[in-house]
């Protein structure tokens, strides 16, 4: 039950999700049961949530007394807090008692716990965080966006394969086009890792467009056509992600200062809001583990849960296993 605004935002997001999901779906709220139960009761008497009371029977509370803080070191947290909501929640999935896991808690701990509990698919060297980036065309998948600060050329190729499955299953793209993020479109541009990765991607049997530049991300396309998947290491990916997150608020402030109506601007820039997409799957683990922003609102949690449901319903995890076998 992690996140900067937990448990309120997490429980509220779960209620919103239950209100929109098919009635056959249920949720497990994992955390300190007394705290979660009190939060659930408090929300259901609020005007904006009271109509969701009929869905409470679809929300099961699972006790997990330990709390992994945002400041905890991942390895120490996993060893020292075995009854945290993160570990308990992931173990439910590993034991077949749930189908997916969503958290807005400590990202490093979630990554480490997912690898320990769910384990990696056979052949996967490292998992990658796959984040949806809004563009002037359609959203694109960028990975890795923070799991691995250093990557080998082989790992970047593997990330491309993971991203292709994501684009096919969750975005409905046919023969997704892959770009390698670099400092120029020419194959010889970039560092040693990106130049070797370029050669490997050309021979990987994917719809590889070649190198793409930072300016191509907002457009969702390069000179060679539309982009569906962008591959980079987690250091670069996370820098780009954090920059993207700051764009909408910055533009809004600038235009409001210039006299443009704030409500109008927020509506126009809605697609740049991370809460629209909710969460990013940790691809490569043998299960569904969705990483949400630490500052996730109830709406963001709701959308992250919907991403998890979509991943389960499209059997994305099985497809990844077959694709990398």
Spans of model-derived segments:
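Phosphate/nucleotide-donor binding subsite
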Residues: 49-98
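Short, conserved active-site loop motifs that form the nucleotide-linked donor/cofactor pocket
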Residues: 58-59, 140, 206
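Solvent-exposed alpha-helices and their adjacent loops that cap or buttress functional pockets
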Residues: 19-21, 52-55, 78-82, 92-96, ...
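Glycine-rich phosphate/diphosphate-binding loop of Rossmann-like nucleotide-binding domains
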Residues: 8-9, 21-28, 33, 149-214, ...
């Amino acid at each position: 039950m992690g996140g900067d605004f937990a448990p309120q935002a997490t429980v509220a997001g779960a209620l919103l999700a239950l209100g929109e999901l098919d009635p056959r779906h249920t949720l497990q709220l994992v955390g300190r049961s007394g705290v979660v139960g009190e939060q659930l009761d408090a929300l259901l008497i609020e005007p904006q949530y009271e109509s969701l009371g009929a869905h409470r029977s679809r929300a099961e509370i699972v006790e997990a007394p330990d709390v992994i803080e945002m400041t905890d070191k991942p390895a120490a947290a996993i060893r020292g807090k075995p009854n945290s909501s993160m570990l308990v929640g992931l173990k439910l999935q590993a034991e077949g008692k749930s189908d997916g896991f969503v958290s807005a808690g400590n990202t490093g701990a979630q990554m480490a716990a997912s690898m320990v509990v769910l384990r990696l698919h056979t052949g996967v060297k490292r998992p990658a965080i796959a984040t949806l980036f809004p563009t002037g065309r359609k959203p694109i998948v960028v990975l890795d966006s923070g799991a691995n600060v250093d990557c080998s050329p082989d790992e970047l190729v593997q990330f491309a394969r993971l991203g292709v499955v994501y684009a096919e299953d969750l975005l409905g793209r046919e023969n997704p086009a892959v770009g390698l993020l670099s400092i120029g479109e020419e194959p010889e541009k970039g560092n040693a890792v990106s130049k070797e990765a370029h050669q490997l991607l050309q021979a990987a049997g994917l719809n590889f467009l070649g190198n793409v530049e930072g300016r191509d991300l907002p457009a969702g396309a390069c000179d060679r056509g539309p982009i569906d998947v962008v591959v980079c290491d987690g250091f670069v990916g996370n820098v780009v992600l954090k920059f993207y997150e700051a764009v909408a608020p910055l533009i809004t402030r600038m235009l409001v200062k210039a006299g443009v109506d704030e409500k109008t601007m927020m509506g126009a820039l809605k697609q740049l809001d991370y809460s629209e997409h909710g969460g990013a799957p940790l691809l490569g683990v043998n299960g569904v583990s969705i990483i949400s922003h630490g500052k996730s609102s109830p709406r963001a949690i709701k959308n992250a849960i919907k991403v998890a449901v979509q991943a389960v319903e499209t059997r994305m995890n099985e497809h990844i296993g077959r694709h990398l076998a």
